[in-house]
Amino acid sequence: MKKRTTVLPGLLLAALATLPLQAATVRIVQTNSAGDSVMLIDPATNTVVGEIKEIEVNHGAAVAPDGSRFYITNEAESTLDIADAKTLKITKHIPLTNHPNNIAVSKDGKRVYVAIVGGPGAVDVIDAASMTRAKSIRTEGGIHNVYVTPDGRFVVAGSIIGKKINVIDQAKEEIVWTLATEEGVRPMAFDVNPDGATKRIFAQLSGFNGFVIVDFAKQQVVDKIKLPELPPAERVTQGLQGSPSHGLAIAPDGKTLCVLSKMNTRVYMYSLPELKLLGESKVGHHPDWLTFTPDSKRVYVANAGSNSVSVVDVAGRKEIAQIPVGQVPKRNITAVLP
C-alpha cells in the first residue's frame, strides 16, 4: 500500500491529533538555509531519518495534500524545486519571477503560493497539475512569508520593505485588502472563530521583540504585546537581522500560542484565546521558526545560530532535546504519513 504524506497547518493538524498514534507516522521537515539539504526528523526518536539533497540555500518547505511531492524554495537559483516524497529526489525546477522566501499550498492542493521577496515583490502562483507558473500577483514590497488561512479562503502575504499585510482572495487570486504596519511584516499565525473563519492575525514586526494582533474582520491592529524583557547581559543583540522576535505558531488544539525571541533565546507560551503568558523555555541560539506535533505536546524550534532543532515539552515548558541538523536551519513544517 502506497504511503501518503500530508502537511499539517492549522485545523488539519488539529483533526489529525485525534487519530490513534499507530495510524500515522509523523515527520518534522527542516530546511537548512545556508546548506544544500532539507532534513526529515522522526519525533519518536528525535533523529534525522531522511534528507532531500542538492537544493542550495533552501528556504521554505511545504507538502502536497496528496503526499506525492515536497515543494521547496531554492534561493540560489530562484526556483521552486519539487521533490518526490517517496524517493526524496528532485524531479522539477520551476523558474520564479525573482528571489523566493516561504511557501503555502491551497487546501485542495491545486495551487502553490510562493513569496517573492526580490523587488518589486509578488506572490507567484504555481499550477500544481502542470507544474508551471500560472500568474504573479504584484504586491507593494517584497514578500517574506505567505500563508493560506485555516479556512482556505484567503492567501495572506507579509512584506518587510513594504511594511504591509496583503490579503488575497484565494478563489479570485486578487488582493482584496491591505493593512499598513509600523514596521516590516515577519512571521504570522492565524486564530479562528468557532465556524473556522479567521478571527485574528498574530504578526511579528521588524525591530519589535513581540507581536501585534490584527482583527481580521475590522482589518486593523487592535493590540501589541511585548515579550518579557531580560537584563542587558542576557540579551542577544548581534545577528538578529532586524527581527528580535521571529517565529510563532498556534498549537493544533488551539489552546496555545508559542512565540520565539531571538533576542531572549526563548520560546514563550501564551494561552488562547486569553493571551495570558503561561511560561517560557530556553532554546538554542537565534531561534527562527517552530512547528508543533499533531498532539500539541511538543514544539520543534529551528535554532539558526546553533545549527540545531530544540524539542520543547509544551506543558512542562522545558527543552528536552536538541537535534543537530544542517547549516542555519530556519523554516520547518510537520508532515504525517498515514
Enumerate the language-model features and the residues they cover.
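Bacterial N-terminal signal peptides
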Residues: P9-P20
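Bacterial N-terminal signal peptides that target proteins for export
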Residues: M1-L11
